[in-house]
Amino acid sequence: LLRHPDQLAAVRDDPDAIGPAIEELLRWLSIVQSAIPRITTTDVEIAGVAIPAGRLVFASLPAGNRDPGFVDSPDVLDIRRGAPGHQAIGHGEHHSLGAPLARMEMRIAFPALLRRFPGLALAEPFDDVQWRSFNFIYGLKSLAVTW
């Protein structure tokens, strides 16, 4: 949101914006990078790629959430979109049990943080932000901000 001031302002100023914003932020910046690894039980072809039986496969959750067949303009953050059906926190029997808590925390924390610090901004260029190297769970090493 700090890179999109117009959308940050909407979340800060419009109580109805937070619900769709949470879903869009989860879709756009998926925290968990892959689904539970699976082993193919039969030969299968996916998008023209042959995968033999017995191979370990990983499903990329961010790739699914950025699929243009799933959402229009997938690389554009649009907090009004809402992005229902994203895979950011699993799906079906593999949906995270903590999902309702995570959504509630974001529903409370984002508006409160943005009201308390209305001038919240990045303190360094976004390209200088350091990311964690562990690739299963996505995140920042740190985030310098000003207010």
What annotation goes with each model-predicted range?
Residues 1-147:
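Cytochrome P450
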